Amino acid sequence: MKYNNQIFLDEFKNKMLEINPQKVLFVCSKDYDRYGYRKALDEISIKSVSFTSFEPCPEVSSVENGIEAYKANECDFVVAVGGGSAIDTAKGIKFYSKLDFDILAVPTTAG
């Protein structure tokens, strides 16, 4: 089976255009640029910032730092790209911030 990343990125761009956020907080690993998500948002003129300061089995302090990044950068949407740690951190940011925003999770692992 061959995976076509461009097809997925096109679907991602279409979904983001539908959602139409002003600024996205990416919760992701430090090397997430290799997946092409930032470039995809740049192509459709949606601003984004990265939050990479979390560890496996995220601590509450990481979630608090994520909330700070979300607020300081005036984000209105979160995209979690990666495995369980990124997705769990994004869920923690939403839950503990008590702010009204949605999350889009993009798992990069399987199994």
Residue map of PLM features:
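Glycine/threonine-rich beta-strand-loop-alpha-helix active-site module
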Residues: 60-111
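ATP/NTP phosphate-donor binding region
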Residues: 1-77
